[in-house]
Amino acid sequence: MYKFILIFSKILFAQLAFGTLLWGVENTIETQVLFRKAVDGYNNIRIPAICKTKDGTLLAFAEGREAGDKGDIDLIMRRSLDGGKTWSGIEVIWDDKDNTCGNPCPVVDLDTGTIWLLLTWNLGSDSEDAIMTGKSEHPRSPWVTYSNDDGKTWAKPKELPHLRKKDWRWYATGPGNGIQLTRGPHKGRLVIPANHSDRITAERDSKTYRSHIIYSDDHGNSWGLGAIQEPLTNESTVVELADGSVMQNMRSYHGKGNRAVAVSEDGGISFAPVYLDDGLQSPVCQANILRFSWPEKNRSRILFSSPTGGKREGITARLSYDEGKTWPVSKMIHEGPGAYSNMVGLTDGTVGLLVEIGDSSPYETVSFITFDINWLEH
């Protein structure tokens, strides 16, 4: 009887797959498929980003792809008015015919309620390799759109050419969310993580990748270029620390199997030298960081989500109590293939995770997983 119960428990635990409840942990984890490849009108759907508006609406973004990383890619979205329990149908925010519209990076201005969405564009005929090696017709460029009605409608996207230096080729905003600073001399600043390749090379070369910062001090009316990080850094995520500084956590090409990190004391205009965080083991992949609670409100908690080990699998949530210095708490959320992710704090105090997961490939679905902080801590 004991063996049967043990085996049955393992089977139930394994059903974190799609649209089911994970039993055995006080019903604190739920998974919904929001986008599924070859079912929801696109052959592939990737690159999740999510935000919660000032009114509490959830906006889940992704790239709707005709094929892979190049070609006809639309920027798509689903909305939830009830904290992620139910969702609207798929809405297309930007479709530029056969061209590539992607890399969503939303940030909510809590002073004005405006949702700003940074994104990128390139010709659909141009691959990342062609763009980086100078064989494309155009480099990749940053754009912005916004919504003043809780994500119901969006302004026509506008190019931001001044945010790309002359020699830069590849360009990517996020993917994931930006933040608004809440304390210190730069309170109110909108901060967007981004990355680029800094020159043309004969072949695609990871040494040309650099993370950087985009920011706005006037509620999105204008955008400036902040700090540029050291080489071998790429897709990144940002979090505000308790003293008002900004931590940028970056995909690393240093070959050490962990994340690159740097901290800014001036809101992202300059950073201390990059260091490799031995406590954050991760494959070469996008990841996400989220401020869950502040020291003055119960306890400092910063969350981090990413695959673990050397492959894109084992989506894991980690927790830091000391402003990202150490990560003593870690639990796996999805054991199978998984890749890009983005977290959001929900109105009911739980955490929402928009993530690429599947049974045999990370790119089968973009799913919305909710979990309770008590489950993570116990």
Predicted regions and their residues:
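Positively charged n-region of N-terminal signal peptides that target proteins for export
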Residues: 1-4
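Bacterial N-terminal signal peptides
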Residues: 8-20
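Asp-box/BNR beta-propeller blade signature and adjacent active/binding-site loops
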Residues: 23-378
